[in-house]
A protein has these predicted regions:
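Beta-strand signatures of extracellular beta-sandwich domains
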Residues: 110-112, 197-199, 240
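Short, solvent-exposed beta-strand-to-loop segments that form ligand-recognition rims
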Residues: 193, 200-219
Length: 249
């Protein structure tokens, strides 16, 4: 196949302007409405719900947006790509983001890759106490869930590769706490052979061979879902997605 100098794929947004205001979300969910986008990323989730949307955080330098999830368990919003990245054909693939939360309660956060990013995207994995429950068939990323016993820690979750992940949260705990009103840089890398790495603030926290299928096509997402009757949210400074172009197609 013919090739050119555009062999690297980089999707990036600093979120210095666009938003999908909560009070206008019904317009985006109406029949026949175009799928909402922010920069190079698509927006999925329960946009027809009352509390959901994506708003600018005015006065915060660099440009930030706030994902506003919903006040129902499992309802929320994600910013990400379509299912377009194959670890074996596009790898290494990576997603990096800088995030912050005003509080760590009443929310479930997923940052990483998943094979499921439908218009009404759900959490790739749910959690309660010390039990992780898979939802999507393939995923690899960070989870922070207020329903976990260790609700402030980031967890390294994965499914779909040669290795079966534990469903006990303590086995996946990175011992890296999120702190309310403090930002963190989170990065997930996946090699062509399915080996995954999790970084927090530039430090390698975990490596897992056979974490994810090498052939299943993935989407990169940053998502926030509610867990109770209190609306959830997540502030995002930037999202970067990196991959290599597959010249064989």
């Amino acid at each position: 196949m013919a090739q050119s100098g555009y062999g690297k794929i980089l999707l990036f947004d600093d979120f210095a302007g666009p938003e999908i205001p909560v009070e206008q979300n019904l317009a985006y969910a109406a029949a026949g409405a175009a799928a909402p986008r922010i920069g190079p990323f698509k927006v999925t989730g329960d946009l027809a719900e009352t509390d959901t949307g994506i708003i600018n955080v005015d006065g915060k330098v660099n440009g930030w947006v706030r994902i506003s999830g919903n006040n129902e368990d499992g309802k929320g919003v994600a910013i990400g790509t379509g299912t377009v990245f194959s670890p074996s054909l596009n790898g290494p693939i990576a997603i990096e983001t800088r995030v912050e939360m005003a509080a760590l309660t009443t929310r479930s956060i997923f940052i990483g890759f998943t094979d499921a990013n439908a218009d009404d995207v759900a959490e790739p994995q749910t959690a309660t106490g010390t039990t992780m429950s898979p939802v999507a068939s393939d995923y690899c990323g960070f989870v922070l869930d207020s329903q976990l016993t260790d609700s402030a820690d980031w967890h390294a979750v994965f499914r779909g590769g040669d290795v079966t992940a534990s469903t006990t949260s303590t086995d996946l705990d990175l011992d890296e706490d999120a702190t309310a009103a403090e930002s963190q840089v989170l990065r997930v890398e996946i090699d062509t052979n399915g080996t995954a790495r999790w970084y927090v603030d530039g430090k390698l926290k975990s490596t897992q061979t056979g974490a994810i299928s090498t052939t299943v096509v993935q989407a990169a997402i940053v998502g926030c879902w509610g867990t109770t009757t209190t609306a959830a949210n997540l502030d995002i400074d930037y999202i970067a997605v990196e991959a290599n172009r597959d010249w064989t197609v």
